[in-house]
Amino acid sequence: YLYNMFLKAKIKIFSVLLIIFQSSFSFSDTFIYSGGCFWCTEADTEKLPGVISVISGFTSGTTPNPKYYPGEWGDHREAALVNFNPNLISLDTLIKHVFKTIDYEDNEGQFCDRGRSYSPAIYYKNDYEKNLISSLAPKSSVVPIEPETKFFPVREEHQDYYLKNPFQYNFYRYRCGRDFRLDELNK
């Protein structure tokens, strides 16, 4: 009886130490891209195994503190900040995913949304990432590959919009023709 209690206590201690050890060595990385409407980029990317979270927001502009009101995001692009575990999903897998979920042949906007704020771009932190993105881009890609700049999260009501407002989100996505065009590109 005492031996079994001792063994159970040892197993519990080992389990706690294992959890502490794993959490102290787990890490994440980030990746930013623009692919049109951030509701869609967030929805398309958040479901990938190894993606911890996706935050909708703005990047690559000069307007201080952009907001989601017409004209108040200035020259920023809508973007997704992807927080991921590189032990579970590689950066090259994420980059390939981006090219499958954007219209890489259109740099004037995406689908029904037009203008710079909806235009695609993929951002890099260093030369390795820049070269990796370039090597994975489809031959017909016109997507700019740019240095990462400050990211500004959008208001909470726009985070996880596809989950909070599924009817409106799905209507918008269908009306915009996003999936129809992606099916054409990814034949």
Spans of features found by a protein language model:
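N-terminal signal peptide c-region/cleavage motif recognized by signal peptidases
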Residues: 21-23
